[in-house]
Amino acid sequence: MNLAMWRKALQVIPNVSRQEWEKLDVVSKWLISTRAAVLVMTLISAMLAGLFAIRDNLFQPLPWLALAFGLIMAHASNNLFNDYTDYVRGVDQKNYYRAMYGPQPLVDGLMTRRQNLTYFVITASLALASGLYLAWYNSFDTLLWILIGLGAFFILFYTWPLKQMALGEVAVVIVWGPLMIGGGYYVLTHNWDWNVVWATLPYALGVTTVIFGKHIDKLEIDYRENIRTLPVLIGEKFARQMVIGMMILPYFLLVYLVATKYFTPLILIVLIAIPRLRQVLPAFLKPKPATRPQDFPEGQGGWPLYFAPLAFGYNRSFGTLFVLGLIADVLIRLLLPAFWR
C-alpha cells in the first residue's frame, strides 16, 4: 500500500518507469491508469447535482453517494477504454501528445491489453452496479434507463466514432452538464427541471474549454493522424474564437437566471473571475506560439500544451467561484425562502 503514490496520483498524472510500476499496489496502478487526477471534474458535477437537490429540499445522502461513486467509476471506465481504443488504432504512439504529457500504460508497456480490459470491466461493473441501485431507488423509471443508456453510449463511443465525427466536444458539454448534473438531479429528486439543465451549462462549458484548448494544441498532429476533432474541422482561428465565446457565455447565462429569479444575486460572485478572464483572453486572440514562451511552464500542466493549461487555470477560478456562489444561493434559499422570488 503506497499512500504517497495514492496522494500524488490524485493530484497529478505521475510518470513512472516500468520498474517503479511493478512495485506499485493495485490501487496505485488503477489511479494512474484511470488518470484519477482529472476525476475531480466528475466529483464536482455530482456535488452540483446534490446542491441543486438540497436547494429544493429533496436531497437523500445514500442515493447521492451512489450517484457520485457511479459517475466517478463511469469516467474512470471511459479513460481506460479511451486508452485501449487509441492504442489499438495506433494513435497513442510516442510522438503523440497523449504520450508526451502523461503516461499511457499500454504505449509505455506498463500494462497489457488484457490487463487494461480487466481494469475496464471491473470499473465499468462498479459503475453499472451504482446505476442499477439508482434504477431500483427510482422504481426502474423509464427516463432513468435512458440516462444510464446515454452514459454507457458516451463511455464506449466517445473516442471512436464521436471524436472522429467532430462530436467529441459536443459530447463533453452534454455529459458534464445536462447528463451528469441535470440527470443526477433527476435521479435524486425524480424531477426533470429545465432550469437546472440551463444552470449546469456554466460548469459544462468551462470543462469543454479545457478539452477544446487541448484539441487546438494538438490540431496539427490530429490533422496528420486524420483525427477529426472540431478544431480540425473548423480551423484554429475559429476554434480559438469559440473558446472565447464559451468563456464569456456563462456570465450571460447566470445573469439571465438571476433576472428570472431562479438564482439569487449571490451567484454573481463569479464576476470576481473577470480579471482572470482578461488575463487569458489575449493568448486566445493569437495562434499558438511555435516555441514555449519563456515564462510558460513545461511538462505536466504546461508545454507542449498551451491553450489547455490557460483554459484550465481560468476555469479553476471561475468554477470555484461558481460552486461557492451556488452554496451561498442554496443557504439563502433554505434560510430565507421568500428572498428574490
Protein language model features and the residues they cover:
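Membrane-embedded alpha-helical segments that form the functional core of polytopic membrane enzymes
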Residues: I44-L48, D56-Y84, W145-L156, N195-G213
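Helix-coil boundary and interhelical linker segments in multi-pass alpha-helical membrane proteins
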Residues: A49-F69, L128-W145, M180-L201, F252-L266, ...
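Multi-pass membrane catalytic core of lipid/isoprenoid biosynthesis enzymes
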Residues: Y96-Y137, I227-P265, Y306-F322
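Intramembrane alpha-helical segments
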Residues: G102-W192
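Acidic (Asp/Glu-rich) catalytic motifs at the cytosolic membrane interface
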Residues: M73-R98, T208-V232, E236-A239
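Topogenic membrane-insertion module of multi-pass membrane proteins
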Residues: M1-L62, A66, G70, M165-G168
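Small-residue-rich segments of transmembrane alpha-helices in multi-pass membrane proteins
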Residues: V40, I44-L48, A171-Y185, L233-E236, ...
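Extended hydrophobic alpha-helices typical of membrane-associated regions
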Residues: A259-L335
